[in-house]
């Protein structure tokens, strides 16, 4: 199975149709830049021009109310476990608190309580999709070296041990990292160049082959 992962579009979606074909496209949030539900819908319209199915979470710059839109289009991973191609996926949208008072933020304690109440948050997991990276994973390092990821996401990785974690949010931390036995992938902002991660995960392999690329 081939998965493409993109994140942090911020309304720049012209390169989506230039991405190579895959079995599944996953979007890690920030469809918009402080946009409305209608703005999210406009980006999704571009995404749906592709032939491959799509699953997604929202980012902290998207309105939380757009979760209903993802649900309506049967593509939400937020606090839901889904299966695709024999792989089990779970997602967390939004992000832990920032200094910027962005639209879709949550406290780590609040998200931990939501996870505890989620009937889907149990059992084996292959892929965690979280807009916010795990704290101290490397994918959460800002320019001054501080780790600003979510401790709740880190705890979830350490508890459920997914082989693959897909995240975004911290633009300057684009890269592939190892954390708690997982491959953690932050492709950086999608942008006009179409930055993305490609994941090849054949049946029978415990871990995928993963690399970063751009389509323009």
Feature roles, as predicted:
Residues 3, 17, 38-41, 46-48, ...:
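Catalytic phosphate/metal-binding cores of nucleic-acid and nucleotide-processing enzymes, i.e., regions
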Residues 1-52, 120-124:
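N-terminal active-site segment of His-dependent metallophosphoesterases
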Residues 9-11, 62-152, 216:
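Conserved catalytic scaffold of divalent metal-dependent phosphoesterases
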Residues 21, 50, 71-73, 85, ...:
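Short, structured coil segments at secondary-structure junctions
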Residues 83-85, 154-160, 173-216:
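Binuclear metal-dependent phosphoesterase catalytic core
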Residues 5-7, 25-30, 54-60, 76-78, ...:
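Active-site neighborhood of phospho(di)ester-bond hydrolases with catalytic His/Asp-centered motifs
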Residues 10-14, 32-38, 60-67, 82, ...:
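Active-site environment of divalent metal-dependent phosphoester hydrolases
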């Amino acid at each position: 199975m081939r998965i493409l992962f993109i994140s942090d579009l911020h309304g720049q979606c012209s390169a989506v149709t230039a991405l190579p074909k895959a079995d599944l496209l996953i979007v890690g949030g920030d469809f918009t830049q402080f946009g409305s539900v209608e703005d999210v819908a406009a980006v999704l319209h571009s995404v749906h021009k592709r032939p491959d199915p799509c699953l997604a979470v929202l980012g902290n710059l998207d309105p939380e109310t757009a979760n209903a839109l993802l649900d309506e289009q049967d593509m939400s991973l937020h606090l839901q476990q889904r299966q695709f191609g024999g792989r089990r996926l779970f997602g967390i949208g939004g992000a832990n608190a920032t200094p910027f008072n962005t639209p879709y933020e949550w406290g780590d304690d609040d998200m931990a309580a939501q996870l505890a109440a989620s009937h889907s948050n149990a059992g084996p997991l292959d892929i965690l999709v979280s807009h916010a990276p795990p704290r101290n994973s490397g994918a959460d390092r800002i320019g001054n070296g501080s780790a600003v990821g979510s401790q709740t996401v880190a705890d979830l990785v350490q508890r459920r041990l997914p082989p693959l974690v897909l995240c975004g949010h911290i633009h300057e931390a684009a890269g592939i990292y190892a954390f708690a036995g997982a491959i953690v992938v932050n492709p950086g902002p999608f942008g006009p160049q179409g930055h993305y991660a490609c994941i090849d995960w054949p049946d029978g392999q415990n871990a995928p082959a993963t690399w970063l690329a751009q389509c323009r």
